[in-house]
Amino acid sequence: MSFVQGLFAARLSRLLHPLLLLVGISLLGDALDIKNSYCKCEEFPIEDRPFVAIWNAPTGGCSVNFSININLRDFDILENPKQTWNGKYVTVFYNAQLGLYPYFTNEQGTNSYNGGMPQLINLAAHLDKMKRDIIKKIPDPDYNGLAIIDWEGWRPTWERNFDSKRIYQSRSVELVQDKHPEWSMENVIEEARKEFERTARVFMESSIKLARQIRPKGLWGFYGFPDCFGSNETNYRCSDDVSKVHH
């Protein structure tokens, strides 16, 4: 099952998380009523549904603070009980919430967490903390909702670390240069690419494998990966060039 991504409306995009398919702004008037919109979760099983829209914006506060209830059941949209950010149907783990994910907080690389680079991480320590983080955030061993790993610091494919993520390429080059100062720049860059992609792949594969072992009924996946980067395509298919990058 793929994760559905969308926006409720452009002007609300900073308030609502872009992981989920949300109803268009034209439906807003119908969605707001005085009825209690909290789902009866047993009415909406996830299994055996080819397409599912799930809401994980923490809009339960709208009812508590403003007496505005957002009714989503009319549109067959699943929501966590009391419309919480994490719950029965969807749980999201961000950079600092799952294990020891390494990343930089700025494109200059002046501030890093857990070494900043997948090449520098202690994988055993990461997996140990990750196990504890999952058990704490998803205490139910039979959890069968979406479990989204939202790691957005870097992308595991070298070519996709462009713009503000270029720091992961440049730091990878520096790591190889420190070990092999006599190498040509061409050889350094090629080795940097190999080392980065190898360690990034091991990091991500080991992480999701462990997650599936701990909560095997959960629908685990990464936010934003793989990505077709095909916003200009009209046939809803990944181009051959993009497909090759992810193989």
Regions found by a protein language model. Name each.
Residues 2-247:
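Glycan-processing catalytic domains of CAZymes
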